[in-house]
Amino acid sequence: MQCFRPKIIGLTTANGNTNENNVYRNNQRILKVAKRQDVPIYRGSKSSLVTTPETTDYFGRDGLGDVDEELTDLVPAKDQGAVSALVELSKTYEGQLTVITLGALTNIAMAIKTDPNFLSRLSHLYVGAGHIHMFVTKLLRNGLTNSFEILCVYSVGQRIGRKLFFIPLSDKDSLP
């Protein structure tokens, strides 16, 4: 029996429930705590493609519960941006790369726009984006705030078969 051993080859950032600068700092915090500062961070979109929603303090001013910790010994982000990194990694790991989104889909939508074959080279794309509004059943929060991006990913994803998965945790009955 073969064991699934995922390898994290990068993180990308985008404006979402907090601004992109906070997302970048929060990724740094998480990687430092996890002792995984070997994982590169590729900075991405600072705004949505059409309408950038206002960020709220729902998860604190920093988007991660207002962790008032001095950040030291951080690894700088890669010079390469998120969109070009996603496209390049999809070519390097063609048929093997699984992308998991935890926020706005702007970088994914831009990767599709940059390279229409981007999604077809992925093994899978899991969209688990910002499920914070429990009253919105079966809709992703970022589907409401980044509707153009989610429509772009969904419409292209329909053509590539069983590689695209939306994880609708916003349905309160589906939570453990």
Give residue ranges: language-model regions.
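N-terminal acidic, glycine/proline-rich low-complexity segments
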Residues: M1-P176
